[in-house]
Amino acid sequence: MLAVELVIVLLAIFLGARLGGIGIGFAGGLGVLALALIGVKPGNIPFDVISIIMAVIAAISAMQVAGGMDYLVQQTEKLLRKNPKHITILAPIVTYFLTIFAGTGNISLSALPVIAEVAKEQGIKPCRPLST
């Protein structure tokens, strides 16, 4: 029985990875449904955690549509290009504040290409500002 459950979970993960975006959530729901159909008893639903995650996703989606993420990345680029010598110190600080302002660390992924580009222009290995 454990092998069947493992196969269902892995198939749901694979399907979600192939679909991407909102499909990840649908694949997870499909996996839970399949597990319930074979008799696995679901546990208590953590509504508090789900509500927090949904609120953060809704907020970041609204910010993306309104252009807020683009604005924050533009401000990041301005700051890093004005102070390129200090990129090793500024890059982690900027990504920290992006995470605080957006409520999720996913916005930091938008700033990584900017950080890498400015570092390369200064002759600094991009791994230094990206890893600190």
UniProtKB/Swiss-Prot annotation:
GO terms for cellular component: plasma membrane. One of its GO terms (molecular function) is antiporter activity. Keywords: Antiport, Cell inner membrane, Cell membrane, Membrane, Transmembrane, Transmembrane helix, Transport. The keyword Magnesium does not apply. Disulfide bonds: none annotated. It is found in: Cell inner membrane. It holds the Pfam family DcuA_DcuB. It is a multi-pass membrane protein. Belongs to the DcuA/DcuB transporter (TC 2.A.13.1) family. This is C4-dicarboxylate transporter DcuA. It comes from Serratia marcescens.
